[in-house]
Amino acid sequence: MSDAILYVSDDSFETDVLKSSKPVLVDFWAEWCGPCKMIAPILEEIADEYADRLRVAKFNIDENPNTPPQYAIRGIPTLLLFKAGKLEATKVGALSKAQLTAFLDSQL
């Protein structure tokens, strides 16, 4: 696991995501989710490569049931990009690294 990835919970979401000084890409995931496991190594690479511009956070929906409904999380993996405490963009489903970097480059 990359040290650059932040693990957030219902309790830490406001502090770690909404009050972050950097944009935060939050991966809503679960242990049983195959596509979530597929994108995990890509997110680790992104966390390292974009460390100067972006925080990458992982949010386990099974362990933290309160936050996902606030953002209408219906399927996983769901990636939400927050800037200055506001939800700026959403991507649902497993993305390739090229798709994810194109998405991030268009938003940052």
Swiss-Prot record:
Family statement: Belongs to the thioredoxin family.
Keyword terms of this UniProt record: Disulfide bond, Electron transport, Redox-active center, Transport
CDD domains recorded: TRX_family
Biological process, per Gene Ontology: cell redox homeostasis
Gene3D superfamilies linked: Glutaredoxin
NCBIfam families given in the database record: PRK09381.1, thioredoxin
Functional description taken from the UniProt entry: Component of the thioredoxin-thioredoxin reductase system. Participates in various redox reactions through the reversible oxidation of its active center dithiol to a disulfide and catalyzes dithiol-disulfide exchange reactions.
SUPFAM superfamilies: Thioredoxin-like
Protein's name in the database: Thioredoxin
A GO-annotated cellular component: cytosol
Gene from which this protein is expressed: trxA
Taxonomic lineage from the root: Bacteria, Pseudomonadati, Pseudomonadota, Acidithiobacillia, Acidithiobacillales
Domain Thioredoxin: 2-108
GO molecular-function terms, A-Z: protein-disulfide reductase activity
UniProt xrefs under PROSITE patterns: THIOREDOXIN_1, THIOREDOXIN_2
Disulfide bond residue pairs: 33-36
One Pfam family hit: Thioredoxin
Coiled coil: none
